[in-house]
Amino acid sequence: MNKIRVEYFTDTLCIWAYSAQVKLDQLKREYPDGIDLKYRFIPIFAAAHDRIQKGWAEKGGFEGYNAHQLKTARAWEHVELHPGIWVDTVPASSTVSHLFLKAAQLLEQDGHSGFAGESTVPGHTRFESLMWRIRCAFFEDCLDICDLAVLTAIADDMG
């Protein structure tokens, strides 16, 4: 059977990508040998602070964006949102996490021994587990995923 290539464009700070993970997992479960999933990182929130400050200036700024995100997430049973995202923690950019994840993805593709081992999330590769944990670090734990120390701690926790 030929695999269908699915190119998934994503940003680690995008709430829609965070909520869509459940659908990607379902796709992988239902067609384990039928899809070739390729992750592509795009800089929607490359300048997150500026994007929200300007885009939400007349709608309450960061507090307004926070309220919008919390309201949006209430419609989804499968996600949790920390009440302080975009207020208590405002990552400057998603770019640092994208570069960190791309490096991990390349290590996994090359079979690097430092990135070997079991995934921490069933049905995920180690790279996918890391990506999920980074998303959760922001959306659920309100951590600054623009901070390399935060990203390194997440990877270290995976072993």
Put a short name on every predicted segment.
Residues 1-7:
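Extreme N-terminal starter segment of soluble prokaryotic enzymes
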Residues 16:
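Short, cysteine/histidine-rich loop/knuckle motifs that typically chelate Zn2+
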Residues 138, 153-159:
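Short, intrinsically disordered, charge-balanced linker/junction segments flanking boundaries
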